[in-house]
Design a protein with these regions (language model features):
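Sec-dependent signal peptide recognition
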Residues: 2-8
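C-terminal motif of bacterial Sec signal peptides marking the signal peptidase cleavage site
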Residues: 14-16
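Substrate-binding/active-site clefts of carbohydrate-active enzymes
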Residues: 20-67, 73-188, 208-217, 221
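Surface-exposed, flexible loop/turn segments at secondary-structure boundaries
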Residues: 77-79, 203, 228-230
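Short catalytic-loop micro-motif centered on adjacent basic/acidic residues
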Residues: 123, 192-198
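Short, glycine/acidic-enriched loop or turn micro-motifs at the edges of active sites
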Residues: 128, 199, 228
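An alpha-helix initiation/capping motif
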Residues: 199-207
């Protein structure tokens, strides 16, 4: 209940602090370069922590002037080396599945459909740099899809991210699997991606993957985490 009250209070403050767009403005063509993006943590947004519960707040977000709902990673979280009891959203075990804590794919689809009915776009937080250390790809025997420590033969750890395994972008099969996973979500109606640590992934991968994504959705919304100039290409 406290989270619900906090959400309502923040929404009320934001609505009160800014003028509401009139009908003509709301019906004007979408401008991706001047859009309002709202980051949504499914687990924390509601007491239930589910897609279905978060869906109930979509009209509130619309009334706040939000254009795009950016979902923090929605995928299953790895168990091996998990940080804390809940784990990090950015330690993904399966790119083509949803975290069962949030619901199933049908619930996710319903969330996206409702957002679209309200004129909202939905983008996913996409973690292309690494997976969890017990990810589906690793369990399936694709060791060559990872950057391995020469002495131990296990995936390297970057920074203090001890729960992740760095992906090997010199491997064409891994690149194809990553692109295929992105297409999976675009075909389900997702409107784009916020690309986590985009600067750690080769620019030619982004260019190749997005060329294929745009074959399905030419107006895909892309947001990169990083200040490197090559990310603007």
């Amino acid at each position: 209940m406290k989270k619900t009250a906090l959400f309502a209070a923040v929404a009320a403050m934001l609505v009160g602090c800014g003028s509401q767009p009139d009908k003509a403005e709301q019906e004007s063509a979408f401008d991706k370069y001047n859009s309002v993006v709202y980051e949504l943590n499914v687990r924390q947004a509601t007491p239930e922590g589910t897609f279905a519960a978060a869906e109930e707040y979509l009209p509130v977000l619309k009334s706040m002037g939000v254009d795009i709902v950016w979902l923090m990673p929605i995928h299953p979280i790895g168990a091996y080396g998990r940080k804390g009891t809940l784990g990090s959203y950015y330690s993904i075990s399966d790119y083509e599945a949803v975290n069962p804590e949030f619901g199933d794919l049908a619930a996710f689809d319903h969330f996206v459909d409702r957002a679209h009915e309200l004129g909202l776009k939905v983008i996913l937080d996409w973690v292309a740099n690494h997976t969890s250390r017990d990810a589906k790809w690793w369990s399936e025997g694709h060791a060559d899809w990872y950057v391995l420590d020469e002495q131990t033969g296990v995936p390297i750890v970057q920074y203090d991210w001890t729960d992740i395994a760095k992906l090997n972008y010199d491997n064409a099969d891994m690149r194809e699997a990553m692109t295929s996973a992105m297409l999976f979500w675009i075909e389900r109606g997702v409107d784009g991606f916020r690309c986590d640590v985009a600067f750690e992934v080769p620019i030619d991968f982004w260019q190749q993957a997005f060329a294929r994504v745009k074959e399905i959705n030419p107006d895909v919304y892309l947001l990169a985490e990083g200040e490197k100039t090559f990310l603007h290409d």
